[in-house]
């Protein structure tokens, strides 16, 4: 059985490196365009909790530029509208290149979700991975 040799991408004259392409990838475009989308609550009048965990949150420290990593925990009681999950994922991913503090990022997430779906109650918790031997947990709450 013969195997074809593995081609070195740099030996292909038509290959382009990521740095050489000026067109953004479809995922980057979706993230850049990402806005929170909502839909009607299917059970208006019934009080229930929605728990969402987003374990891949990243942003950049506004002072050092180093990346910060966190798990974002959302718990909310919807009123008339519910946040669509793919839109929420793309919205969260939009923070990856932003220079923003732990405190501001968690507060901004809460403000944006409240503006999008006006829940009866919401808690947003950012559990940031330790950096420099410091572990930070930021929790904010809003209630009508």
Curated annotation (Swiss-Prot):
Keywords: Cytoplasm, NADP, Oxidoreductase, Queuosine biosynthesis. It catalyses: 7-aminomethyl-7-carbaguanine + 2 NADP(+) = 7-cyano-7-deazaguanine + 2 NADPH + 3 H(+). Its main location: cytoplasm. Gene3D superfamilies: 3.30.1130.10. InterPro entries: GTP-CH-I_C/QueF, NADPH_dep_7-cyano-7-deazaG_red, QueF, QueF_type1. Its EC number is 1.7.1.13. The active site is at residues 61, 68. It is found in: Cytoplasm. Residues 1-27 are annotated as: Disordered. It holds the Pfam family QueF. The keyword Oxidoreductase applies. GO terms for molecular function: preQ1 synthase activity. The keyword Oxidoreductase applies. Substrate binds at residues 83-85, 102-103. Catalyzes the NADPH-dependent reduction of 7-cyano-7-deazaguanine (preQ0) to 7-aminomethyl-7-deazaguanine (preQ1). This is NADPH-dependent 7-cyano-7-deazaguanine reductase. It comes from Acaryochloris marina (strain MBIC 11017).
